[in-house]
Structure formats: C-alpha cells, structure tokens
A protein has these predicted regions:
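C-terminal lobe helix-coil module of Hanks-type protein kinase domains
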Residues: 1-91
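Short, low-complexity patches enriched in S/T/P/G
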Residues: 95-110
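Single-pass transmembrane signal-anchor helices and their membrane-water interface zones
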Residues: 110-131, 136
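Catalytic-center loop of serine/cysteine hydrolases
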Residues: 125-128, 134, 162-304
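A structural "domain/chain start" motif
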Residues: 129-157
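Glycine-centered tight turns that cap/initiate beta-strands
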Residues: 169-172, 314, 580
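Short coil/linker segments at helix-helix boundaries
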Residues: 279-394, 398-408, 425-429, 433-436, ...
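Alpha-helical protein-protein interaction modules
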Residues: 382-384, 395-398, 404-592
C-alpha cells in the first residue's frame, strides 16, 4: 500500500523538524516493538516551540492502521499549507509567543512554512527516488522462537519455510532456499554481510509465537545495501487461520517491494482455507522431522503426516509431505523402489486433486514418471509444471538438472544447476554437484579441482564417492580406494562399502568384492536385498552375464540407478556392448 510511503515520509519530516526519531528504543528489537505497539512521541514534547497542530498531523501520518493515514502525499502537504495560512492569518494581531518562536525557526531554516513545504516535497522526491523501484531477490531468515520453549522450534521453522514457499511462487522474485537460510539460525552476523553472502537485495527477519489458539508473526524488511528498515508489521490470527496469515504476510511483502505479480500469482497469494489446528500442528512437526534426513526422523515424519490427515482428510500439504518423504526414502535406498514409487504417486496425485498448484507435488510426480513409467516427455512436463508453480524451489532445478544429465543434455543441465545455486548459494550438495556434472561431461581434471574445493569446505559422502569414480576412470586406484574409505567414514554405509570393494577389484584385489558378493547373495535368500549392489559387484569382477541379469532385476523393481547409469563413464565399454544391456536400455527408452 502506498500509505506505507506516507508513514515513512512522516518519519523523515518528524526527524527534520525535531532532530529526533518518533519511535525510541535502546536496541533494534525495542525500536521495532515501539513502531508496532506505541504512539510516537509528541513533536511538541520534543521541541516546545512547534505548533500543537503538528501533533495531529504526525499522529495521522504515523498511524498504525494504514486506513487512518493520509491517502496521498498531496493531502499531507495540504494540511501543512492550511497550518501555515492559519498562522499567517494572525499577523494582523499579536501572535502567541509560541507561534512567534516557531515562525522564527522556520524563517531561519528557509523563510516560512511555504519553504518548509517545498523542502518537504523535495525531500519526499529524493526519499522516494532513493528507494529501489523493485527488489528482485530476498532471503527469509529463520524466524525467532519467541516462546523460549525449544519444543516450539518446529513452529518457528515451519513458519519460516511456509513464507519461503509462498514467496517462491512469484516468478519475478528470487527467493533463497531453506537450506541456505537455515545456516543463519541464531547467527550474529550483520544483516548487510548476510545479504552479501546470499547475494540478495533484501532480508526479511522476525519472530513467530504461538500462545494457545493464537499465533503472532512479527516481520520486518531490511534493504540490504543501506541496512535501512523499509517496513515492519505485526500479524495475529487464530491458529485455524494460519494459512491465511502466511499469505497475508507474503502479500504485504510483495506489495512493499513492488515486485511484478501476475494475476495467477496474485490469486495464489489470496486463496486459502481454514485448517484444523491439530492437523496443521502435526504437519509442522512432520516437516520439521523430515528435514533432518535420517531414517528414524523420516519415519517419524510419516507418522505425523498421517496424524494430520486423520484430523483433516483434505489437507493437501500433508499428502505432499508424505509424497516427499517416500521420495527421500527411495533415493536413500530405505524402501523397496516399487513400494516407494507407488506411495509417491498415490500421495502426489491426491495432493494435486485438492490443489493443482503445489509445485512440490508436481516434482514428486516427475520422479514417478521418470523412474517408474520411463516416460521422459511426461517427466519434463512435470518438471516444468513444478517450476511454473514454484519458480524459486531449488530442489526442482537440481533434479531437473540430473534428469538432463541422464538424458545427455549436459549444457541444459549446467544452466539449471547454475540457477539452483543462485537460489541456494550455500548448499554443499549443489557446490559439489557441479563437479558431478563435469565428471559426466568427461572433464575429469576440472571435476577433481571443483570437488576437492568443496570437500575442503565440508567433507561428505557424495563428493568423496564422485571423486573416487573419477580416479577409477583415470586408473588411479590407490586414490580411488582412499576416497571410498572416506565415504564410509562419512556415513556412506553399504553403498560405499560396495564402491570400495569394486575399487579393490579393479586394482587387482578381488577378494573383498567376492566376499561381499557372497554375503549379499546369502542374505538375499532370506530377506530383501537391493539388486543394485549385487550387479555392480559382478560388473567389477568382470562377470557381465550375471551383472546384466541382476541389472534386469533392478529394472523390474524400478530402481533409480537404471536411469542413471547409461551416461555414467564408468559403465562404458564391456557393459555397453553386452546385447542384453542394449536391449534393456532400449526398453527403458535411453537408446532409440
């Protein structure tokens, strides 16, 4: 609302006349509290030679409710002009001492109130010119938990993620992802420094608090370059209206930063439904848990999402949460592929039947179409829908880039991963992913440099494993073995153990691979064992018929690795020339 600008200029004019700011506080949060909850100090109390009528003018300009402020700057100026005429009209008689004193001050600074108004309007022009026309990028820092109860962290984190999700629907706005902003939780870094690291124009910070059935969000917007407070507001609603509140805050932000919002985006930011309080609380707890990415927490998250749906069977976000959780379980090899894919499809379709604009649900469907259906045109359509509804969701760009790599469209993949890095600049996964792209593009030396840089910043399984694969391609077996050992140390589990066994086999020491293979085959007669590790061990031992036989089983189970291997350099050569492998790749659709 343009009346926010009236308020801002009121602050400037107040300071120009009194030499003081209208709202006081010993520290930043105290000033914000004063802005949101207290009336400004009377101008006449600060400078007793000012006319009392100015108190009324400032009271209106600085009103908490925008509806109570002047509608236009012209109206503001008109009241100042009227005040001047009122004082000028007293020239014929003896002016009150107070008016005389004020008039002298005005004459001193420019020759009367007309000059002051001219100065005010000039200051307004400069003030508004100084403000950026639009803010194109923003970071929502983790909202503070003002309940001081650690058990309520899930609520503050959930509200942070909700605001990121809502703002991410605006195509013209680059919104930094959750992964990067959560690194600043409880950070004491100055806001301009944070903004510089994230490369954003503005920072949104604030707090979230729940007391009984009421929720309160305090939000403030800071311009990154100048560290200037652009806007601050307090929002309070019943818990059942939490979805309305999230959209209300997001609308206020988009209005303040003057970003271009399409009619469809505006509709999304204006449409919400009441939600069962217990259902949403369970949903937030589930979301909090699945973001920890451990098997235990993922399964606990499922239980909370299911609890939410028992309270509200039409709660689309809970269905999306379930779909995303099974997606994570699938790619972490913690669920049988067919079971995971069936759950992903069921929950994503249910979510979209309630709300077709859920970008995250479209992203899950893209994985189903790619891995389960081998429908690659359909996969790309779902990726595009996901980006249409959530254009600042970095995970979509990341998986879309993976898909492009596996389809052999490397240049497009690199463009997508660059976009993901703009949204999620501090993600260690994305920093290392560019090394994986270079590996698939056979640029091994560049990939080694990139991955080593990332490992120096944050040791992790993915980069160590990719670096090991590169060394295998360069026949640097001792270096590869060292990388896979580190991957095991970082928590890579049985998959990293398999990689290490394969590396030893290529180095002419097949004993570990044979022992591991024998153990897995023995286990598979008693319980489910993923065929992924078995076929790769056969491959490393040079037993291609057995390798392809187990790869065919992996394809039957719809293992994601079937899509990933065709463009992977390490599987070229003997495997690619095997007739049954060629037949399988044609069936999948990777060979025309």
């Amino acid at each position: 609302d343009h009346r926010t600008d009236i308020w801002s200029f009121g602050v400037v004019l107040y300071e120009m006349l009194t030499g003081k700011l209208p709202f006081k506080g010993d520290y930043e949060q105290a000033v914000i509290y004063s802005i949101l909850n207290e009336k400004p100090t009377l101008a006449t109390a600060v400078k007793n030679n000012l006319p009392a009528e100015l108190d009324h003018i400032f009271d209106k300009a600085l009103a908490k409710d925008p509806q109570e402020r002047y509608y236009r700057l012209d109206d503001f100026a008109a009241e100042l002009k009227a005040l001047e005429k009122q004082i000028e009209g007293k020239k014929a008689g003896e002016e009150p001492i107070r008016a005389k004193s004020w008039k002298k001050k005005l004459l001193f600074i420019g020759g009367g109130l007309v000059i002051l108004i001219g100065m005010a309007l000039l200051a307004a022009a400069l003030f508004f010119k100084e403000k950026p026309k639009t803010i194109d990028s923003i970071a929502v820092l983790p909202l503070q938990n003002y309940s001081h109860d650690p058990e309520q962290d899930y609520f503050a984190d959930g509200m942070t993620e909700a605001l990121i999700t809502e703002l991410s629907k605006i195509k013209a706005l680059r919104v930094i992802s959750r992964t990067s902003v959560m690194l600043y939780k409880k950070s004491t870094k100055p806001l301009p420094e944070i903004a510089h690291e994230l490369k954003v124009d503005a920072i949104l910070e604030g707090s979230a608090q729940r007391v009984g059935d009421r929720i309160r969000i305090t939000a403030q917007l800071i311009e990154a370059r100048s560290d200037r407070h652009l806007w601050a507001e307090d929002f309070e609603r019943d818990f059942r209206d939490i979805l309305f509140l999230q959209k209300e805050v997001s609308r206020a932000i988009t209005s303040e930063i003057r970003i271009a919002v399409t009619p469809e985006e505006s509709k999304q930011l204006s449409t919400a439904r009441e939600v069962n309080a217990e259902a949403h609380e369970a949903y937030l707890k589930g979301l909090y848990l699945i973001n920890k990415f451990t098997e235990t927490d993922l399964n606990k998250g499922i239980a909370f999402f299911e609890k939410a749906l028992k309270k509200d069977p039409e709660y689309a976000l809970a269905y999306t949460g379930l779909a995303e959780t099974y997606d994570n379980l699938l790619f972490m090899s913690l669920v049988r592929p067919k079971e995971g894919l069936q759950k992903m499809k069921e929950y994503a379709l249910k979510a979209l039947s309630i709300d077709e604009s859920l970008g995250e649900a479209h992203l899950v469907l893209s994985a189903v179409k790619m891995i389960n259906d081998w429908d690659f045109p359909g996969t790309e359509r779902e990726f595009k829908l996901a980006l249409q509804f959530s254009p600042s969701y970095s995970t979509t760009y990341t998986w879309y880039a993976c898909f492009m790599l596996w389809m052999g469209r490397n240049d497009e993949a690199l463009t997508l991963i660059q976009r993901a890095q703009e949204i999620d600049p501090l993600s260690p996964t994305l920093r290392g992913f560019s090394g994986y792209c270079l590996y698939l593009d056979r640029q091994y030396d560049k990939a080694i440099i990139r991955i080593k840089e990332n490992l120096a910043l944050e040791p992790n399984v993915f980069d160590s494993s990719t670096l090991g694969c590169i060394y295998l391609q360069k026949r640097m077996y001792e270096e590869a073995i060292a990388c896979f050992k580190k991957a095991i140390d970082y928590g890579g589990g049985v998959m990293s153990e398999k990689d290490l066994a394969c590396a030893y086999a290529f180095a002419g020491k097949p004993a570990m691979a044979r022992n591991m293979l024998a153990n897995l085959l023995k286990q598979s007669s008693k319980k489910y064992v993923s065929p992924d590790n078995i076929w790769q061990l056969y491959w490393a031992l040079g037993e291609m018929d057995n390798a392809v036989a187990w790869l065919e089983k992996a394809a039957e189970e719809r293992s994601p690795i079937v899509i990933m291997i065709y463009r992977d350099p390490q599987f070229e050569g003997v495997l690619h020339s095997h007739p049954r492998f060629i037949t399988l790749m044609k069936k999948v659709g990777l060979i025309k």
